[in-house]
Amino acid sequence: MEAPPVTMMPVTGGTINMMEYLLQGSVLDHSLESLIHRLRGLCDNMEPETFVDHEMVFLLKGQQASPFVLRARRSLDRAGAPWHLRYLGQPEMGDKNRHALVRNCVDIATSENLTDFLMEMGFRMDHEFVARGHLFRKGIMKIVVYKIFRILVPGNTDNTEALSLSYLVELSVVAPAGQDMVSDDMRNFAEQLKPLVHLEKIDPKRLM
Amino acid sequence: MGLGPGCPGEWEFPERRTGGWGAGRSRTVTSPKDLDTPFLVGVSTGRCVFNVSSGAPASIRALFSEVVSPRVGCWSTPHFSCLILPSSWPDTMGVTCVSQMPVAEGKSVQQTVELLTRKLEMLGAEKQGTFCVDCETYHTAASTLGSQGQAGKLMYVMHNSEYPLSCFALFENGPCLVADTNFDVLMVKLKGFFQSAKASKIETRGTRYQYCDFLVKVGTVTMGPSARGISVEVEYGPCVVASDCWSLLLEFLQSFLGSHTPGAPAVFGNRHDAVYSPADTMVQYMELFNKIRKQQQVIETRKPNQ
């Protein structure tokens, strides 16, 4: 059972509800360079940052209709970095004028025995993949351009194959609940990336 | 030392132990009382970087020996510049023994705690603030059990004031997860699957004493409003390998606990050469809390027979 929707409530039980605002799009492989070039110009000045992450999605099935989903992510190229556990709630429906997809999110840094611990809790791994790409920042906005790789042998992250001939582009912000002006800023930034990539609010339910 | 806040400086620390994960630690002054927050690691390739928080004067050397993380692989003599980054990452701590002090005959819990602390003060230990370790118990909700086909397990979620930005989650005889405090928020989301056992919150609160390289914490264990026992935690800072310093720890424990000195904790048992970590301390506290919970149940079941 999911917790009650955390719509406009900034604080629940003493903790701040953080929401993730998300816009997604994609580019074909051959357009990657021009996109990276534009992003380097628009975003904060920093060393180009690439990443290789291994993400595993865990499900806990109860008697409720929908299982509880947790995402565990670890870095394959940065030794010693903590594992990242993420909970994403259901997308907030409602305001059609809101430009970005909004969902409750809880981010937790953990030690390396996360998968063992989740199994002990009763979670089972549903699927896993490797994400390889570039990271940019503009203020509180994070822009990630990455390719998803399918893992052929479970647990073996060296043996992978690309899922498609394109890169996924995500523009996201994690901010306290109730700050909808964030989605306006995101839309303005997304405008600047047209026509290289069209970032839009994609409802995951419509795809299933 | 005379270092001002944020002033860079460099120190050399000799290797104390090579091989294994290769970190060397050497302890000099031991009074990190100037910093409120626990510190740790900004690390990059053999150089540990720490940021001095404003107002911390000369007792900075104390912090270095606390902070070198074996995982970094500081093979050669580490050089430190004076920047300590407060971090929630409890990666390493000195070997620690957590035990229970029985309440003295004819005395209350508080009086026994006072006896102990007076003994410590006479030894020459310095009071250094307070500490708190708490523990909540969760069990798998009945609705989840059916599909898993296994007996409900108990999960303990603990906090330690020594690491205020961290949360420890563990199963008995199972893995101990070290996470940041957002884990508590996640447990709220998991309410449907994991329920908090009624009135299960148990905690120990008390004073910290520093005596040379030993950090002693004497606390009163309480469940709700009632005091149930006394916990004694002793940490020997300079050493991270249990088998290397257990005899020294034992001697020190005997000097103020006398006949109530405990045996070697179970966590030391299997992994003689493994590096000690804060998760091991939390396992010891969990065992102590469980023992105290059972003791109370025994007392309560005896009463009707009297």
From Swiss-Prot, chain A:
Protein name from the UniProt record: Mediator of RNA polymerase II transcription subunit 18
Function statement: Component of the Mediator complex, a coactivator involved in the regulated transcription of nearly all RNA polymerase II-dependent genes. Mediator functions as a bridge to convey information from gene-specific regulatory proteins to the basal RNA polymerase II transcription machinery. Mediator is recruited to promoters by direct interactions with regulatory proteins and serves as a scaffold for the assembly of a functional preinitiation complex with RNA polymerase II and the general transcription factors.
Gene giving rise to this polypeptide: MED18
PANTHER family the UniProt entry points to: MEDIATOR OF RNA POLYMERASE II TRANSCRIPTION SUBUNIT 18 (PTHR13321:SF2), MEDIATOR OF RNA POLYMERASE II TRANSCRIPTION, SUBUNIT 18 (PTHR13321)
One of the GO biological process terms: positive regulation of transcription initiation by RNA polymerase II
GO cellular component entries: core mediator complex; mediator complex
Single GO MF annotation: transcription coregulator activity
Subunit details: Component of the Mediator complex, which is composed of MED1, MED4, MED6, MED7, MED8, MED9, MED10, MED11, MED12, MED13, MED13L, MED14, MED15, MED16, MED17, MED18, MED19, MED20, MED21, MED22, MED23, MED24, MED25, MED26, MED27, MED29, MED30, MED31, CCNC, CDK8 and CDC2L6/CDK11. The MED12, MED13, CCNC and CDK8 subunits form a distinct module termed the CDK8 module. Mediator containing the CDK8 module is less active than Mediator lacking this module in supporting transcriptional activation.
Chain positions found as Phosphoserine: 66
Lineage, uppermost ranks: Eukaryota, Metazoa, Chordata, Craniata, Vertebrata
Alphabetical keyword list: Activator, Nucleus, Phosphoprotein, Transcription, Transcription regulation
InterPro entries reported for this sequence: Mediator_Med18
Membership in a protein family: Belongs to the Mediator complex subunit 18 family.
Subcellular location: Nucleus
